[in-house]
Amino acid sequence: MSVYAVGLTGGVACGKSLLAQLFEALNTTVVDADTIARQVVEPGPVLNCIVARFGSKILRADGCLDRRFLRQRVFADVAERKALEAIVHPVIRARLKQAAAAAAGPYVLVVIPLLAEAGGRIGYPWLQRILVVDAIPEVQHARLMQRDSIDAEQASLMIAAQIGRKERLAIADDIVFNDGDPAHLGGQVCNLDARYRALASVFSDVD
């Protein structure tokens, strides 16, 4: 792939969306896996496969996916979640790569929430660099409770359902610490943007 691609990941409520917005403000092209995931499950062949596996109860009256119902069904069942991922993840990965390859600009930022779960570059070998946005667990927990209007137990369950912080940080080439200080966060993003532009300027695709 000829474009210089940086993968962005982080735990729930660590600030992936905020970081992506800050990069966009610097005229960086951003491709978001969550956006593509929503497109993938619109009425069509992928949704048909999901219905064949999970039944028509996952559909709303208008024939579209009831995302909340399906999320609740697979959240507490590892086998069900893996079955869903086996259907949608290959399609999402292929479309992510296509979107990244078509991106304009010196480099593209690809937001992938489950990048660590995919093994980092094992799952996404076309990424040249991986950026992890991190927050201390106490801050992450408090943000999640406030953002989703949930109690402490629910927040703990959501965080526990993800890969561990240590494993996520282990795949990072770069780390941004989102401590809640906008100036500090903005400064980190500006420095990284300059670094990525410099790296992209000398990047040569070897595929």
From Swiss-Prot:
SUPFAM superfamilies the UniProt entry points to = P-loop containing nucleoside triphosphate hydrolases
- DPCK domain: from which residue to which, for each copy? 5-203
Q: Please provide one cellular component term from the Gene Ontology annotations of this protein.
A: cytoplasm
According to its UniProt record, this protein's enzyme class is transferase
Q: Which GO BP terms apply? A: coenzyme A biosynthetic process
Catalysis: reaction(s): 3'-dephospho-CoA + ATP = ADP + CoA + H(+)
Q: What is its EC number?
A: 2.7.1.24
GO MF terms here are: ATP binding; dephospho-CoA kinase activity
Q: In which pathway does it act?
A: Cofactor biosynthesis; coenzyme A biosynthesis; CoA from (R)-pantothenate: step 5/5
Write out the annotated subcellular location: Cytoplasm
UniProt keywords (A-Z) are: ATP-binding, Coenzyme A biosynthesis, Cytoplasm, Kinase, Nucleotide-binding, Transferase
Binding positions for ATP per the UniProt entry:
A13, C14, G15, K16, S17, L18
Q: What family is it from?
A: Belongs to the CoaE family.
Which NCBIfam families does UniProt cross-reference here?
A: dephospho-CoA kinase
Show the PANTHER family listed in the entry: BIFUNCTIONAL COENZYME A SYNTHASE-RELATED, DEPHOSPHO-COA KINASE-RELATED
HAMAP family, alphabetized = Dephospho_CoA_kinase (MF_00376)
Q: What is this protein called?
A: Dephospho-CoA kinase
Organism, as annotated: Xylella fastidiosa (strain Temecula1 / ATCC 700964)
Organism classification: Bacteria, Pseudomonadati, Pseudomonadota, Gammaproteobacteria, Lysobacterales
